[in-house]
């Protein structure tokens, strides 16, 4: 069987759902949205309750659960690489931190030939267009967009306030909005949660607007096998439904839009014959277009947890016990309030570790419990932790297809920690985190250091801890980068170089990873490119002011050295 649409979107994630919603605002445009995962089950607390964020990472229903090849600089560990599966993509299983990146990230992109319109002031209107912030709009925030953003409220956990205060006492700036005028410093962290306390994935915020439109067709459990071409023009998609092996063909009159994420987008392009010719020939894949950058330039954020015992019973450790969870769940389900309605990442910060960095190179997430991101290895006592990670590692990895079978995962190698700068940043980061945690604001709460532990002090000891314990922050990106150099895959509008009717729109097209979590920026990029696809005028540039550190010192004098 075959069907025909104006546009076919492959992947209903943070970007694909934006494109599906915006393109079908034009009633004369037909769109097919293909998603390999299932629906956004609204009664499944695992994806709807913010505090349950660890659960989707533990199974396979919502998580592709990729693994890396042995990482050579990480004691050859095979490392987790979770990616979302289902309507919403990774916005269905992420930590819900609403962080956009630093203004200078985007100004850096705009210095690349062909990317001049990706400056911060060009991007800010699209961040605002996507957002509804619960305390109202301003120059930096939107008031009527599809993404619900919730700010921390008075009366939340005292550890959040103590950790921010400790950062300020350590000599770093205070900022009231990590997405506003000044990212650098410590302050409250916004989250993608609805006013009713539900996860604000793009399947909810965007697709709910568009589902009823007659010009949008959504097919779930549809695994795209390959893109179909006539010469250099993309003309359709062959996909498999459920566990079946009989391909279904859909044709695109205008364009095929690949929104499968930083792992699956290059994998799909390579499987379709677009990528490094030698790799494709090794797998007997006919080369449609030799494009060496497909799957190259892969980047991610790596992070560590620094954990402390808590002397007062104020952490959320009791909430990790099964006997307390029914009451928490009921309060969330019926009232949309309480511990269940928060992702518990309500404070954080960004700092520069050395004068050489023009903008922050380390991010902190503060958490009022001592536990792994995926819910494992919880410390069996009251505790708290800082997630600390470097933001713009010089290490580069790659995605290589291993098979023509669309159900087989690709070979993934990030080359984490492959540069001396990586080691320097993490050593600096651990030592500076300890200084922050040692400030007077945390005196009422801070018990012994649980991890790494006070015995871990020398460079060699820190390096061994990093090798064994650093984990992904789940931010793969840049594997189909925008630009005009020989390794660029797409131009500044997501159009694949050397091809017609084919775009990539997702985190894979970032030329360089940003300073912060990726979801908000991925949504912004899709909003921006949607206007290009529709032939609309770009939104007017913002005139908002933003902070540039310039000659400002990295930090002031700490209260306690």
UniProtKB/Swiss-Prot annotation:
UniProtKB keywords: FAD, Flavoprotein, NAD, Oxidoreductase
Record Gene3D superfamilies: FAD/NAD(P)-binding domain, Glucose Oxidase, domain 3
Positions in coiled-coil regions: none
SUPFAM superfamilies from the UniProt entry: FAD-linked reductases, C-terminal domain, FAD/NAD(P)-binding domain
Pathway: Amine and polyamine biosynthesis; betaine biosynthesis via choline pathway; betaine aldehyde from choline (cytochrome c reductase route): step 1/1
Biological process terms in GO annotation: glycine betaine biosynthetic process from choline
Catalytic machinery residues: 475 (proton acceptor)
Entry annotated with the keyword NAD: yes
Binding site residues for FAD: 6-35
Needed cofactors: FAD
EC number of this enzyme: 1.1.99.1, 1.2.1.8
Pfam annotation, one family: GMC_oxred_C
Catalytic reaction list: choline + A = betaine aldehyde + AH2; betaine aldehyde + NAD(+) + H2O = glycine betaine + NADH + 2 H(+)
Source species, domain of life: Bacteria
GO cellular component, one term: membrane
Single GO term (MF): flavin adenine dinucleotide binding
Disulfide bonds: none
InterPro entries in the record: BetA, FAD/NAD-bd_sf, GMC_OxRdtase, GMC_OxRdtase_N, GMC_OxRtase_C
Family, per entry: Belongs to the GMC oxidoreductase family.
Role played: Involved in the biosynthesis of the osmoprotectant glycine betaine. Catalyzes the oxidation of choline to betaine aldehyde and betaine aldehyde to glycine betaine at the same rate.
Database matches in HAMAP family: Choline_dehydrogen
Name listed for the protein in its UniProt record: Oxygen-dependent choline dehydrogenase
Source organism of the structure: Pseudomonas aeruginosa (strain ATCC 15692 / DSM 22644 / CIP 104116 / JCM 14847 / LMG 12228 / 1C / PRS 101 / PAO1)
Gene this protein is translated from: betA
């Amino acid at each position: 069987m075959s069907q025909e649409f104006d546009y076919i979107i492959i992947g209903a994630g943070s970007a694909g759902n934006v494109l599906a919603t915006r393109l079908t605002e034009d009633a004369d445009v037909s769109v097919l949205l293909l998603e390999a995962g299932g629906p956004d089950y609204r009664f499944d607390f695992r994806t709807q309750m913010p505090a349950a964020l660890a659960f989707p990472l533990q199974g396979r229903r919502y998580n592709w659960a990729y693994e890396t090849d042995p990482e050579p600089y990480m004691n050859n560990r095979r490392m987790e690489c979770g990616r979302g599966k289902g309507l919403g993509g990774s916005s269905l299983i992420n930590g819900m931190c609403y962080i956009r990146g630093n203004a200078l990230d985007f100004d850096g992109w705009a210095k690349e030939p062909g990317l001049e319109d990706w400056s911060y002031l060009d991007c800010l209107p699209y961040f605002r267009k996507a957002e509804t912030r619960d305390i109202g709009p301003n120059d930096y925030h939107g008031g009527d967009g599809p993404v619900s953003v919730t700010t921390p409220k008075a009366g939340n956990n005292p550890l959040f306030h103590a950790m921010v205060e400790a950062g300020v006492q350590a000599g770093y700036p205070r900022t009231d909005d990590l997405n506003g005028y000044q990212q650098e410093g410590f302050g409250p962290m916004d989250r993608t949660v609805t006013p009713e306390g539900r996860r604000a994935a793009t399947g909810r915020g965007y697709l709910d607007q568009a589902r009823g439109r007659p010009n949008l067709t959504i097919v779930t459990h549809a695994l795209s096998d390959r893109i179909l071409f006539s010469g250099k023009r993309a003309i359709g998609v062959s996909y498999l439904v459920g566990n079946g092996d009989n391909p279904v063909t859909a044709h695109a009159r205008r364009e095929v839009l690949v929104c499968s994420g930083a792992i699956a987008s290059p994998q799909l392009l390579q499987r379709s014959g677009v990528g490094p010719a030698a790799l494709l020939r090794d797998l007997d894949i006919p080369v449609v277009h030799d494009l060496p950058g497909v799957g190259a330039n892969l980047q991610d954020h790596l992070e560590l947890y620094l954990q402390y015992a808590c002397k007062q019973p104020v952490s959320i450790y009791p909430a990790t016990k099964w006997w307390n969870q029914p009451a928490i769940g009921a309060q969330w389900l019926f009232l949309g309030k309480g511990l269940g309605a928060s992702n518990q990442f309500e404070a954080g910060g960004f700092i520069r570790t050395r004068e050489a960095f023009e903008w922050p190179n380390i991010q902190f997430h503060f958490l009022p419990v001592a536990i792994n991101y995926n819910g494992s290895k919880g410390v069996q006592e009251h505790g708290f932790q800082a997630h600390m990670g470097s933001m713009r590692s010089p290490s580069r990895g790659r995605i290589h297809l291993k098979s023509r079978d669309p159900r087989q995962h690709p070979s993934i190698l990030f080359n984490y920690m492959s540069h001396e700068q990586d080691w320097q940043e993490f050593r600096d980061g651990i030592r500076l985190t300890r200084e922050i945690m040692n400030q007077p604001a945390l005196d009422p709460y801070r018990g012994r250091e649980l991890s790494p532990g006070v015995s871990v002090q020398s460079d060699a000891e820190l390096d061994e801890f990093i090798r064994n314990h650093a984990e992904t922050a789940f931010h793969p990106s840049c594997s189909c980068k925008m630009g005009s150099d020989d390794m660029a895959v797409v131009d500044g509008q997501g159009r694949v170089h050397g091809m017609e009717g084919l775009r990539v729109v997702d985190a894979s097209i970032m030329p360089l990873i940003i300073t912060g979590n990726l979801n908000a920026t991925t949504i912004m990029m899709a909003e921006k490119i949607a206007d290009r696809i529709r032939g609309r005028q770009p939104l007017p540039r913002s005139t908002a002011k933003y902070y540039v550190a310039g000659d400002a010192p990295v930090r002031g004098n700490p209260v306690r050295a």
